[in-house]
């Protein structure tokens, strides 16, 4: 702690010196507007570590999914157990799976202000306006779903004039994508505007099943449709309506014994998800404040299945080893938030205070139907083979009710004190066919206080203290109920206290845009999940146990720099440095002082953008991270990697032609690892890794109208 405090002091002093002594600015860099906060504000007024991905960065990605964009964000990782990444980690904090059907997210995930926490797989990014990744607890803004941070995606809103875009992509591994988005005023009435989006993405999936002689057992077959309507009812009242559907029909044949991209499964699984969403926003202006209502609902159907033995009769011979698992999941959510947002403060008019007050209600319902079957036989056993079959169902319902508020006070025209608080009540009801039932409740509170110094030229310096929280829960598969006396049944809420200082400034006549953040986080009652396999010969017999470690520590540095070397050449660097530690976990002394899972010490993205002529451009970037532990259940680690991507484009009037390569040097890198025995007859514990996508090449054509 002393070293960290000393580092923080040095960082603060140096940033203060540069902040007050270097001649900066002329406003040549376009102002970034924060859209994920309660009110849209310039980035200079933001008091969080947030990284922005604008529409140009998003359009430049050949594969339109947030999973691809996440590589550009330091201290953001994901667990690739499934066909699409659903679970993300920010600064080493976040779930890596969701097998049990009791949602409890650490990373908030909002798309157009609709909560998809724990369902990040649906985050297709065609016709997206901006993505904001908030690193650090958002206790006052979001509450229990954002202990580690928040991923906020804003799709394009309807425009006053008719406009649109279309895109066609073709690439190796069967990559084919087509999309169109358009909208504007409805007839001649500009009070009602709309935007319609249709998109289809397909790919073979970068794997080949040698047993079935097929290259599509991990294919991507994804569609996105979205309609947004904005209606200016009166001069004081505005309504926004959204309806969307994302349908991911993706088989999941991704795990292999040898870690290669050649699978052997005889019964490939599925990782499909279909989500229908509805949202209504109402804004009504009163004298001095605006009343806002956000109403949303989602309905999600998931099929998650897999060939648990990863092989076939020939690969396991002479042993009979054949297991399969399928989970059918239905999740429904309803969310209602009411806010009163004051008019912005203005020091020059003696308006020193701006405030937000509101209430939020979130209801979640989930049902799961799980079916497992298996067959195991040893040729030396005259009584085999032995068949197994297991089926269970469960129901889960939770409700979160919270009250929140935020007060900003202008101490001067350039100095603002901000204070926010949130109180939340959580109740859950769980029951299953195994006679397990639980009715836990928690009351939690969090908040934030910050001091922000800004200048008229767009630079800012801030210091903040924030507290986030995450509800507790219960462990399944112990054969116990809520009233049973066992220390392993329930676990407590986790709290995170985060200390942060940051700077956002422009240097050298605005040719450099620099953001830097130093943070230190204390985790109280850290929730740690470990898994065990009860029957080594049955890969479907894993149990999961979550316990509270006494504490954890996460601290580090985050930096983003964009530099215009010339009018036609620019470079960028995004860097994250992260140190994590598990401390004082009484039941797992072997993990004392070890780094937390999925928390690489260094993550980075750097690249250049070059415009050699008026009509051509070249973009190349390098992304990567250092090794990290796969789990808190074992000490196996990934290997460090760096991956390169290239885009070469030509622009002519409204047409854009692009040649792209992802994973330019065909880097072989792992994104997830399991440690258990899956090879008969001894079932020796072995590290099995899932590797990322190989090099793929394609062309994209875009027409804007």
Model-inferred region functions:
Residues 31, 67, 87-89, 133, ...:
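N-terminal periplasmic accessory domains that precede
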Residues 163-165, 170-203, 207-250, 274-280, ...:
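Transmembrane beta-barrel wall of Gram-negative outer-membrane proteins
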Residues 67, 71-114:
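Extracytoplasmic beta-strand/coil segments of soluble accessory domains associated
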Residues 341-343, 355-358, 410, 416-417, ...:
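Gram-negative outer-membrane beta-barrel transporters
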Residues 230-235, 244, 340-343, 352-356, ...:
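Structural signature of Gram-negative outer-membrane beta-barrels, strongest in the C-terminal barrel
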Residues 98-99, 106-137:
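Short acidic/polar hinge/loop motifs at secondary-structure boundaries
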Residues 571, 627-629, 650-705:
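C-terminal beta-signal and adjacent terminal beta-strands/loops
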Residues 281-308, 454, 458-466, 490-555, ...:
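Membrane-embedded beta-barrel scaffold of Gram-negative outer-membrane proteins
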